[in-house]
Amino acid sequence: MEHNIPELVAQLTLEEKAGLCSGADFWHTKTVERLGIPTLMVSDGPHGLRTQDPERDDPNHSRKAVCFPAGCSVAASFDPDLARREGAAIGREARAFGVGVVLGPAINIKRSPLCGRNFEYYSEDPVLAGELAAGYINGVQSQGVGTSIKHFAANNQEYRRMSASSDMTERTLREIYLPAFETAVKKSQPWTVMCSYNRVNDVFASESRMLLTDILRTEWNFKGFVMSDWGAVADRVKGVAAGLDLEMPGSGGVNDAKIVAAVKAGTLSEAALNKAVIRILNIVFRAADEAAAPAPELDLKGDHTIAAELAKECAVLLQNRGVLPLKKGSKVVYIGGFAKTPRYQGGGSSHINTIRVDSALEMAESHGRRVSYVEGFPADLDQREEEEFLRAVSAAAEADAAVIFAGLPESFESEGFDRSHMRLPESQNNLIARVAAVQKNTVVVLHTGSPVECPWANDVNAVLCMYLGGEGVGAAADALLWGDANPSGRLPETWPLRLEDTPCYLDFPGDGRHVEYREGVYVGYRWYDARKMPVLWPFGHGLSYTGFVYRNAQLTADEFAEGDSVRVRVSVKNVGMMPGKEVVQLYVADCTGTTGRPPKELRKFVKVKLEPGEEKQVEFTLTAQDLSYYDETLGSWYAAPGEYKILLGHSSRDIHATLSVRFSTPRRRPFVIAENTTIGELSKDDRTAAIIQQVLAQAGNALTGGNAGGSEIASSEAVAQMLDSMPLRGIVNFGGPAAAGMITPLLEILRAAIQ
């Protein structure tokens, strides 16, 4: 249906326009009945609906809905199509419930494993997070329901999240904390974006024109409206001017009155207010038009089945020394409260009132497996009961295998607070160690929203991470443990050996007012690889019950130029006896030496399904953007000319093929040549390298105290290192041919070379 929104806005009073820019309550926008402006209903959350029960006044009492795998699990699938399928199922439920916008996905970068909301977020890597977000958004919006991608931007902790400032360089912001949002906006155009509580470089996100207008709308061409996180508005008038359209929930009219007063006083332009109202009404009427079509039939039972299927794809087999899959008919004891009452979702705004929850124990019994159960430790407490502890150890010793279901209780990680350590409850660690001592076939199944320290990792036979797999997690665990399904998940985040190894250990969570992002772009695997640090399990890691080999990696060209592209091809073969899925990961390494960069960065990935003996060729296309970093001097992305390595592999530390490509570009970084410009800087620039080498050759003995001829100067390692940091004026000081009267002509020659 056609709606002339600008004409409608022209008929609104100033007070009505201000009122439309805030919520009517927790979940609805305001109406203007005289002009036929309807309400828009929004609902949490990213992995299932938390929709207020219309029979209850309590905004936290929600209707029954299906809990799908949380963001931490979806990310482990490395499969944007899986994210799309989850989104589509949530979108169908939203349509049936009358929801116009789903408040998700949540895609903040996992800067530290301690962040209490990491279970809701996707990854430490912006490429992975962005591709999954785009898939999810496309899925939800394919059902005629909008999304609200959140939390924009740099909301990476819960401590003081409503006021702390995330302080970082522009390069760090652009390379790590914004790209996932950019990918999602450009590939899927979410109907709305939710701004975060925090400040970014001392400016509240809700008041940042740079974020909400300059970057989001001007650079990325975002077409929807921006809403606040619940209670995130600091200065409503500044927010409207910056590009914050909708305040949620409403302020009881307080902020509406401030908008009216500011317009009347001339401190806020009515044109800015009109833009906000137009953007809101575009989505309000779009949602109303979609809702006018017949809604799909609500099928919670079918969606539960989908949730369980998705959970199988998201589980990560971290290690396996031959015990998995469990042998059919073997005598197995399940230990741990999570076997009976799994932790399948996180706490906070995304908490879902589920229709049912499968447990691994229930599913094993329903399939007639030879499984016994001993609690060993409770699911929700760090508590050791000696009798139960000893029963578990005894049962493990008598079984063919012991499967311990461990993980973090909700009291350990949730929205609203951060963890202070990475440890599992001591009752769990102690029991795992004791069981492993008496049973060589010990398997640990982890239910957690974020990495944990695993001091017993070398003592157990296998570790299967289910993350927070949704209400079907028990069915998924059962299928994976017993070989009815093959694990294909990969880690979307590095699992460090200990908390002290993490990139922001000294700066998380900050002093309360400011959080210094001193690690810069070295987040996650970028940090561990740059420091060559051992980790427990690397980014991208995940095992299978089958095997894969890579062959015939090749480039379509050995070099390419700005504006062109190059294709990368590699064949992958399943060499095992079971169908499986391999995640081919492509990393880029900058060999130009132009600036400090991580040793490698994920740029592409694809999940490939292969039958036993089947081989498929996968292909990636690379452009200059895939080689680029954000150059603050240029104020834009930049790929330096020179050599780049293309790495293809199974994880960030399991590379199967390395290729080399050269890149050329007419673009150059600004190069100001003066007396203090170093020999090293001039030698690395292909426009000045030959000139400076000639000068060095002429300088000869003067630079080395008579110990080396001019022809040897560049090959002497000690001298080369000294010269690398020597300024041009140093040649003068050593009495070379560029002495006093020659420095000016030399500068002119060098400057002319870079014009």
Regions found by a protein language model. Name each.
Residues 79, 125, 208, 418, ...:
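Short, solvent-exposed helix-helix connector turns and helix-capping sites enriched
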Residues 677-744:
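Conserved, compact domain cores that house catalytic/ligand-binding motifs in diverse enzymes
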Residues 664-684:
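Low-complexity, Pro/Ser/Thr- and charge-rich linker/hinge segments at domain boundaries
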Residues 135, 139, 691-695, 749:
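Generic non-transmembrane alpha-helical segments
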Residues 1-4, 662-664, 755:
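Basic/polar N-terminal segments that are highly enriched at the extreme N-terminus
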Residues 624-667:
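Terminal connector regions
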Residues 746-755:
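Globin-like tetrapyrrole-binding proteins
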Residues 1-628, 643-648, 652:
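Glycoside hydrolase catalytic-domain context in secreted enzymes
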